[in-house]
Each structure stands twice: as structure tokens, then as C-alpha cells.
């Protein structure tokens, strides 16, 4: 059985086109989800010479999603073929993009002051598998606030191995190179092998503020109390105030609960939870995940694929849906984009509020 030109995934308002050609005379019956379809209205059925069978459903709607089957029969045999038709988008947004609020959110973050005088900068720790764009998130956020493309942190998605080898804090600066009260710590990627990538013990030490800048990750041994880069008396300012898990929107469908990378992320989340540290997810590469979003980021919260990726992430890692934020990093762009900035700023705003709540509670204890 043939399918629509773009496969079985179509946009709302498109025409569903399915066809079949038989090499002998047969009778045909079209069904959708086991219910017989009849010619009329938006449904057009054509049987030509008892050999060519076609079905068109115009102005596709949510109700047209389903499994379409053509049953063919003659005196000698009975066969059938099926095609699943899926609409790429919902009728309405399932979360607001709030593009008009982007400038206001940016100004609020630029003027932000930490609510605890013991802490000059809120500290965010990025964790996630190799190649998800952790370093690119830091570059993208700095690009937004500086008004130009910034490559503060090295990135390399081609090797399949972590490009980050040392623990380092990266400041966020505005257009005048003034540091904003946010610092991002990047770590070695979590590889999908038990003995590769950053060690859980090192990440937990980082959460506790026990890892100094410059510490080089070692997949075979964790930081010890005798190490030069071990902080034996971390202050609240040294500790992580929000854990940011970074997930590739398309690759999340390739993971299972048993995968080492997923297990590592869950262990780190549990450690953060035990410490009272809040956590969020930044879901990257949304343009690779859905053709609608690749065409226009305005479709981000109409996309069924993006919502499915977020739900899959929630199921695997355990983060609530309202703490998962789809974002797009700058990659090949040379100029800023309002929709890209809207997504990353709203994600950062949520992370900042969560981190500030954490340090405020600590000040009252």
C-alpha cells in the first residue's frame, strides 16, 4: 500500500493520500480503525478497473489519525495492507511560547539580584550524555545577553566522546562584558558505558561544592580529599544551586531505562534531591526532532513529536513535564533569532527562580 508523499506523518489541513495497485481484478474495501469508510464529504474513494485503489481524505484533522486498511479479495484469495496516519501537530498549543515577553524576561534576568547575600552568583551544573549540547547552551545564553555570537566554551559533536575534560565555571556576561549573577559549570559527558565518562562520585562532589575549577575528570578514579582540587570547606556560594540535565530531543527515543547514561542521570538527580537542590531539563536539538519545528520554531508547542520527547524524558529520567524546557542552541547562525532567544530565556528564567528559591531557603536555616 502506498502512503502520503511525506510518509504517514502529515500536517493539519493536508490531504491524506493512500493507494494500492493489484496485478489482478479484485474487490476492495477501505477501513479506518476497523470501521468501513464510504465515499463522500472529505473522503474520496476510487476503484479503477478493479486494480487501482486510492483513498483521499481532504483537510486532515485530529479525527483522521489512525490505522487505514485496504482489504482486497476475489474468489481465490483475500489480502490486506495498512498504513498508520499521524498528524504532526495538535489543534492548539499545549504550552505558550510567549514570544512577546522575551525582552521583558531578558531585562528581568539582566537586573536580577540573588536573594541571599552570601551568594554572589547562582551556580548551575550541566549534566547529560555526550553530544547533547551542554557547552553550546553556555555559548547560546552568552550570545543572547551579549547580542552577538559567542563561543566561550569549546564544542565537538563529531567524536562521540566527551569534549569537556576539566571542571570549569563559565560566567554569563552582558553586552558590556559585565558579569550577570549566573555561573554555569560544565562537566564531562555521561557516556553510555559504565566505565566511561564522568564518574557519579565526581558529579555528586561537584553538587556539594567540593570540586575546584581546573579539576580534570578521570573515568577510572574519582576526586579524593587529598587532591589539590578538593574543596574541604565549601561555602554556600561554592555549591550547586540548580542541576540542569541536558537531553537531545531526538535521541531520547533511543534510550531505555536500563541504559547506563539514564541510570547515571537518575543517580545524580537522586543525589541532588537528597541535598535539596532543584533540577530542570533543557531539551536540545528540537529542530532535529520534528520537521514542523525545523521549519518554524513557532510550532514548538504545537508539535506532537516534541511533546512525546518531553514525556519520554519525564518517564525515563523522572523530571516532571513542567520542569522540562525544549530549547535550540545556536550552531551555524551568525545573527540572533527571536524565537531561539525566547525558548532559552524562558528556560533560564525557570532555572534561576528555582536556584534562587534554594539559596533563599538556605539563608533562613
Protein language model features and the residues they cover:
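Structural beta-strand segments of beta-rich domains
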Residues: 6, 14-18, 122
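Core motif of extracellular immunoglobulin-like domains
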Residues: 20, 29-31, 70
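Extracellular beta-strand/loop-rich beta-sandwich domains predominantly from IgSF
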Residues: 41-76
Amino acid at each position: 500500500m502506498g502512503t502520503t508523499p511525506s510518509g504517514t506523518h502529515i500536517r493539519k489541513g493536508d490531504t491524506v493520500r493512500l493507494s494500492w495497485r493489484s496485478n489482478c481484478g479484485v474487490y476492495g474495501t477501505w477501513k479506518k480503525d476497523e470501521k468501513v469508510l464510504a465515499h463522500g464529504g472529505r473522503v474520496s474513494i476510487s476503484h479503477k478497473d478493479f486494480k487501482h485503489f486510492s483513498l483521499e481524505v481532504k483537510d486532515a484533522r485530529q479525527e483522521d489519525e489512525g490505522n487505514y486498511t485496504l482489504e482486497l479479495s476475489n474468489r481465490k484469495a483475500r489480502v490486506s495492507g495498512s498504513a498508520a496516519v499521524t498528524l504532526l501537530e495538535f489543534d492548539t498549543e499545549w504550552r505558550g511560547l510567549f514570544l512577546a515577553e522575551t525582552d521583558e524576561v531578558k531585562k528581568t534576568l539582566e537586573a536580577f539580584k540573588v536573594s541571599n547575600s552570601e551568594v554572589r552568583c547562582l551556580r548551575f551544573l550541566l549534566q547529560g550524555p555526550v553530544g547533547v549540547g551542554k557547552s553550546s547552551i553556555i555559548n547560546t545564553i552568552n550570545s543572547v545577553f551579549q547580542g552577538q555570537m559567542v563561543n566561550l566554551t569549546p564544542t565537538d559533536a563529531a567524536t562521540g566522546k566527551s569534549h569537556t575534560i576539566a571542571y570549569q565555571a563559565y560566567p554569563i556576561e552582558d553586552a558590556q562584558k559585565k558579569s550577570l549573577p549566573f555561573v554555569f559549570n560544565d562537566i564531562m559527558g555521561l557516556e553510555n558505558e559504565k566505565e566511561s565518562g564522568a564518574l557519579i562520585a565526581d558529579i555528586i562532589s561537584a553538587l556539594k561544592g567540593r570540586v575546584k575549577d581546573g579539576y580534570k575528570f578521570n573515568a577510572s578514579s574519582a576526586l579524593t580529599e587529598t587532591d589539590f582540587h578538593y574543596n574541604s570547606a565549601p561555602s554556600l556560594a561554592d555549591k550547586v544551586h540548580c542541576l540542569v540535565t541536558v537531553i537531545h530531543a531526538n535521541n531520547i527515543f533511543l534510550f531505555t531505562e536500563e541504559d547506563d547514561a539514564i541510570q547515571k542521570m537518575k543517580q545524580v538527580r537522586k543525589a541532588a534531591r537528597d541535598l535539596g537542590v532543584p533540577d530542570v531539563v533543557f531539551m536540545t536539538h528540537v529542530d532535529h526532532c520534528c520537521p514542523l519545528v525545523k521549519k518554524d520554531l513557532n510550532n514548538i508547542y504545537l508539535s506532537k513529536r516534541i511533546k512525546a520527547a518531553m514525556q519520554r524524558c519525564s518517564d525515563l529520567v523522572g523530571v516532571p513535564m513542567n520542569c522540562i524546557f525544549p530549547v535550540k542552541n545556536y550552531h551555524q547562525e551568525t545573527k540572533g533569532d527571536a524565537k531561539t532567544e525566547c525558548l532559552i530565556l524562558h528556560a533560564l528564567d525557570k532555572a534561576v527562580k528555582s536556584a534562587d528559591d534554594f539559596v533563599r531557603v538556605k539563608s533562613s536555616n
